[in-house]
From Swiss-Prot:
Function per UniProt: Non-selective calcium permeant cation channel involved in detection of noxious chemical and thermal stimuli. Seems to mediate proton influx and may be involved in intracellular acidosis in nociceptive neurons. Involved in mediation of inflammatory pain and hyperalgesia. Sensitized by a phosphatidylinositol second messenger system activated by receptor tyrosine kinases, which involves PKC isozymes and PCL. Activation by vanilloids, like capsaicin, and temperatures higher than 42 degrees Celsius.
Ranges in the topological domain labelled Extracellular: 458-475, 536-538, 602-633, 656-659
Record's protein name: Transient receptor potential cation channel subfamily V member 1
Gene coding for it: Trpv1
Binding annotation for ATP: 118, 158, 163, 167, 202-205, 213-214
Chain positions covered by the region annotation Disordered: 1-64
Length: 842
């Protein structure tokens, strides 16, 4: 029998007890293996069905048990090599193969253990290294590897390494380094360490993903040292962003997983390790980088926003130091969105505000800033905001994404109040769009006057089309009709263009696009009028008057140009969509129900003479109906019941019934439910709606005006867009490769009573209008001071170049030491730069 040799003393130890091996190793063919743990899911189909419903099991889904099966009896195998397991202190175990001489000195050979998936999985799950002592010998003797299919879970493709990673004890599992050493000696280390799940639910997840998810830096280091692929993508259903299904989207890659789980140390290790550094610009299956993934996991809560913005800032700075020329924030996903545009489109207002107002103080990373403080005086400071990816001159700009996003996007109205978006839209409105909008309003008013006049003086004799008489009035009328039809054609094609470009959903059609829809319906009625007119049908008048009525209603669209009227129009819209629609649904149900009951009760001919005489005497003076009115129809009964709703009904409008008590009870119940209950409830709901949306009405109006501004700009020619573009091209510093960093910037003057000018980045000593006065700049990359409203005509680049020249030949007459300025972030957001500010103050 084989004996085991101690590495320290070389003395023999007692042999392992006989019961350490299964009975079948002793040749007992009748012995049965112990029962395996039951499956969580009997089949892959049942498992996917259960997860689709969101059910759970006591056992972790990724740690499901292996299949239950019996071991086939095999003869005992003897080998001449021995595996020695040595534990060095508290560190990981290691394994080595003894030489033949050592084996000979150990004594007689011992029968070798047989291993299958069940035995290996049990050993690694229980952290039992002794059970795996003969595993290497078994694999070498049988010429097998741990990556063979017989050692993997047939349903999920899970290996023993993945099983061990899922069964850590106090953050470690001693079988992991042993398994890696065995894989190395069987020439399958790379394949073994990068083995991943193969089922559709956890497809692509490797041991490195699990180690990062378990927040275990030691295991991450061990796996990377042994060749783990840092670009492995976990793209199973569990790792996709699917509405209504459990899962966690983190960007598929290990780097994104570490970032989205707030593990900065692992992020730095993955990017800076000497074995296989991760690619910071790598994308997942939807084209998202690590920055996109951070935006995706943001949920607008304070704690989450703080960690996401902090991690975003750290990765951005680290990427700039590792790859100075890489523009990580400008990389787009498959939808063509940058991280900034993605934050705007998904309503992540905290992340959006951070990116727009980011001001980095480190000189080597200052080119990552999107905000540059120009000067400060007390609580007042002037800032230059970078307009790249913001203005409409670029595709998928932030303004377009917010304005044209779905109505279900959270914080859609509030995002337009974040600087510089708020001031930028106001500048666009004041400079150009306002005048164009008022001109369009005037033209539309003139169009409606012409349309109304032509409709009012339409011919009434004969059938259309009418002959043109040689009279001045007919010429004016025909001219008005032609202009009215031309306006309808214009609104029709404009509506077609709008629907093709925006492709709004049914909900967005009534919430955000109601004005465009009304203009389109107005055009449809006008075109129907033309068709009926030339078809010799007098019914053209019906469609014409509908188009005329909608035309005047659409005048409310132009209230967007006036704040008070615009907010009032928003309230009307919300009350119609929220309260009136629900009221009309319930009211129509009551009206139809009681009308069918009353019309069933009424019998024509019953007491006809008395009824006709009484009703004729009662109603003829009001001109409401003739003496021979019949109420044995649903239409006439509905009209009578509608009069009860507005308080003009008569309980004795007919006597053609047999059961007077039943008739009166029906009418009284209808009056109570509609005139008393529903109408008063509608009034109360409208009052509540006004109070509720009073605060957000201004934001909604600003959103509507922003849409109008962008629609107006789209009608400009390309040369006009450049001429009317807000902001100015300025040099704000130098790029990492030494070139001029020129950006299109927009100036915003802000007042902040909580952050004073004790911390200054780029600042002029003389704020305001000080032309001709010598300026002392306080930073090596200084910008010139822009004064007042004429800041666009001020040349900033010469001052920067002059400042840079002086910095290259240092002999300053005096040193001005000013501490860096944090910016205009909110108090909660300003804490994100707390560490960098403290370091700068030191």
């Amino acid at each position: 029998m084989k004996r085991w040799v101690s590495l320290d003393s070389g003395e023999s130890e007692d042999p392992l007890p006989e019961d350490t091996c299964p009975d079948l190793l002793d040749g007992d063919s009748n012995a049965k293996p112990p029962p395996a743990k039951p499956h969580i899911f009997s089949t892959a189909k049942s498992r996917s069905r259960l997860f689709g419903k969101g059910d759970s099991e006591e056992t972790s889904p990724m740690d499901c048990s292996y299949e239950e099966g019996e071991l086939a009896p095999c003869p005992a195998i003897t080998v001449s090599s021995v595996i020695i397991v040595q534990r060095s202190g508290d560190g990981p175990t290691c394994a080595r193969q003894l030489s033949q001489d050592s084996v000979a000195a150990a004594g007689a050979e011992k029968p070798l253990k047989l291993y299958d998936r069940r035995r290996i999985f049990e050993a690694v799950a229980q952290n039992n290294c002794q059970e795996l002592e003969s595993l290497l010998c078994f694999l070498q003797r049988s010429k097998k590897r741990l990556t063979d299919s017989e050692f993997k879970d047939p349903e999920t493709g899970k290996t023993c390494l993945l099983k061990a990673m899922l069964n850590l004890h106090s953050g470690q599992n001693d079988t992991i380094p042993l398994l890696l050493e065995i894989a190395r000696q069987t020439d399958s280390l790379k394949e073994f360490v990068n083995a991943s799940y193969t089922d559709s639910y956890y497809k692509g997840q490797t041991a490195l993903h699990i180690a990062i998810e378990r927040r275990n830096m030691a295991l991450v280091t061990l796996l990377v040292e042994n060749g783990a692929d840092v670009q492995a993508a976990a793209n199973g259903d569990f790792f996709k962003k699917t509405k209504g299904r459990p899962g966690f989207y983190f960007g598929e890659l290990p780097l994104s997983l570490a970032a989205c789980t707030n593990q900065l140390a692992i992020v730095k290790f993955l990017l800076q390790n000497s074995w296989q550094p991760a690619d910071i610009s790598a994308r997942d299956s939807v084209g998202n980088t690590v920055l996109h993934a951070l935006v995706e996991v943001a949920d607008n809560t304070p704690d989450n926003t703080k960690f996401v913005t902090s991690m975003y800032n750290e990765i951005l700075i680290l990427g700039a130091k590792l790859h100075p020329t890489l523009k990580l924030e400008e990389l787009i996903n498959k939808k063509g969105l940058t991280p900034l545009a993605l934050a705007a489109g998904s309503g992540k207002i905290g992340v959006l505000a951070y990116i727009l107002q980011r001001e980095i103080l480190e000189p080597e990373c200052r080119h990552l800033s999107r905000k540059f403080t120009e000067w400060a005086y007390g609580p007042v400071h002037s800032s230059l905001y970078d307009l790249s990816c913001i203005d409409t001159c670029e595709r998928n700009s932030v303004l377009e994404v917010i304005a044209y996003s779905s109505s279900e996007t959270p914080n859609r109205h509030d995002m337009l109040l974040v600087e510089p978006l708020n001031r930028l839209l106001q500048d666009k409105w004041d400079r150009v769009v306002k005048r164009i909008f008022y001109f369009n309003f005037f033209v539309y008013c003139l169009y409606m006057i012409i349309f109304t006049t032509a409709a009012y003086y339409r011919p009434v004799d004969g059938l259309p089309p009418y002959k043109l008489r040689n009279l001045p009035g007919d010429y004016f009328r025909v001219t008005g009709e032609i202009l009215s039809v031309a306006g309808g054609v214009y609104f029709f094609f404009r509506g077609i263009q709008y629907f093709l470009q925006r492709r709004p959903s049914m909900k967005a059609l009534f919430v955000d696009s109601y004005s465009e829809m009304l203009f389109f319906v107005q055009a449809l009625f006008m075109l129907a009028t033309v068709v009926l007119y030339f078809s010799h049908c007098k019914e053209y008048v019906a469609t014409m008057v509908f188009s005329l009525a909608l035309g005047w209603i659409n005048m409310l669209y132009y209230t967007r140009g006036f704040q008070q009227m615009g907010i009032y129009a928003v309230m009307i819209e919300k009350m119609i969509l929220r309260d009136l629609c629900r009221f009309m649904f319930v009211y129509l149900v009551f009206l139809f129900g009681f009308s069918t009951a009353v019309v069933t009760l009424i019998e024509d001919g019953k007491n006809s003479s008395t009824s006709a005489e009484s009703t004729s005497h009662r109603w003829r003076g009001f001109g409401c109906r003739s003496s021979d009115s019949s109420y044995n129809s649903l239409y006439s009964t509905c009209l009578e019941l509608f009069k009860f709703t507005i308080g003009m009904g008569d309980l004795e409008f007919t006597e053609n019934y047999d059961f007077k008590a039943v008739f009166i009870i029906l009418l009284l119940a209808y009056v109570i439910l509609t005139y008393i209950l529903l109408l008063n409830m509608l009034i109360a709901l409208m009052g509540e709606t006004v109070n509720k949306i009073a605060q957000e009405s201004k934001s909604i109006w600003k959103l509507q005006r922003a849409i109008t501004i962008l629609d107006t700009e789209k009608g400009f020619l390309k040369c006009m867009r450049k001429a009317f573009r807000s902001g100015k091209l300025l040099q704000v510093g130098y790029t990492p490769d030494g070139k001029d960093d020129c950006r299109w910037c927009f100036r915003v003057d802000e007042v902040n009573w909580t952050t004073w000018n004790t911390n200054v980045g780029i600042i002029n000593e003389d704020p305001g209008n000080c032309e001709g006065v010598k300026r002392t700049l306080s930073f090596s990359l200084r910008s010139g001071r822009v004064s007042g409203r004429n800041w666009k005509n001020f040349a900033l680049v010469p001052l920067l170049r002059d400042a840079s020249t002086r910095d290259r030949h240092p002999x300053p007459p005096e040193d001005v030491h000013l501490r860096p300025f944090v910016g205009s972030l909110k108090p909660g957001d300003a804490e994100l730069f707390k560490d960098s500010v403290a370091a700068a103050e030191k």
